Curated annotation (Swiss-Prot):
The chain crosses the membrane at residues 7-27, 106-126, 189-209. One of its GO terms (biological process) is potassium ion transport. It comes from the Eukaryota. It comes from Liriodendron tulipifera. The gene is cemA. It is found in: Plastid, Chloroplast inner membrane. One of its GO terms (cellular component) is chloroplast inner membrane. Belongs to the CemA family. GO terms for molecular function: antiporter activity; proton transmembrane transporter activity. This is Potassium/proton antiporter CemA. InterPro entries: CemA. The keyword Ligase does not apply.
Length: 229
């Protein structure tokens, strides 16, 4: 019986890993028709940001420039100009459709992520006993490691996360999260997060080392500083 109770966190851990993926797929499919119908009915412009508006205007300017360029190169008969205008009109309609699809994508992904976060939060609260057992496993595993391996692991993680070569990885990760929420790519925001987030993590890590590790395992701090030098 105790052995069976000790193994119960394993299915719980597996469910935590796969539950976000399942929630994302199921809610995306179930919410998509409702969000599409709501957007097409309301035609709200609340979610229009400056970057999307700039992209739409750039496309319209390109279409206008193409039309003017074709008229300057040679004189079109009336029928050809009419065909050209029809083509530009079709391209404009396609641009509006793409604009609406982008907004639907933003609303759908943002709603799905909020729902996923709420469900996982409730799931974690309900599975508090399993989390306690998992925490005891992790603590026991870390306790059995030598100070050298612990210090090496801390150095490896810090170099990967906040080392001099980590900005590109942070840029990819933050860009992926940004895209997953359905927001348009924004180099300024991503660059700002990349330049500040690792610094915050580095400060938290240093505080943790000096405040927590110095109290719990002074020998580990000595080994860490020796390896870091």
């Amino acid at each position: 019986m105790p052995k069976k109770k000790a193994l119960t966190p394993l299915p719980y851990l597996a469910s935590i890993v796969f539950l976000p993926w399942w929630i994302s797929i199921s809610f995306n499919k179930s919410l998509e028709p409702w969000v599409t119908n709501w957007w097409n009915t309301r035609q709200s412009e609340t979610f229009l940001n400056d970057i999307q508006e700039k992209n739409v205007l750039e496309r319209f300017i390109e279409l206008e420039q193409l039309f003017l360029l074709d008229e300057m190169i040679k004189e079109y008969p009336g029928t050809q100009i009419q065909k050209l205008r029809i083509g530009i009109h079709k391209e404009t309609i396609q641009l509006v459709k793409m604009h609406n699809e982008d907004h639907i994508h933003i609303i759908l992904h943002f709603s799905t992520n909020i729902i996923c976060f709420a469900i996982l939060s409730g799931y974690s609260i309900l599975g508090n006993e399993e989390l306690v057992i998992l925490n005891s496993w992790v603590q026991e595993f870390l306790y059995n490691l030598s100070d050298t391996i612990k210090a090496f692991s801390i150095l490896l993680l810090t170099d990967l996360c906040i080392g001099f070569h980590s900005p590109h990885g942070w840029e990819l990760m933050i860009g992926s999260v940004y895209k997953d929420f359905g927001f348009a790519h924004n180099d300024q925001i991503i660059s700002g997060l990349v330049s500040t987030f690792p610094v915050i993590l580095d400060t938290i890590l240093k505080y943790w080392i000096f405040h927590y590790l110095n109290r719990v395992s002074p020998s580990l701090v000595v080994v860490y500083h020796s390896m870091n030098e």
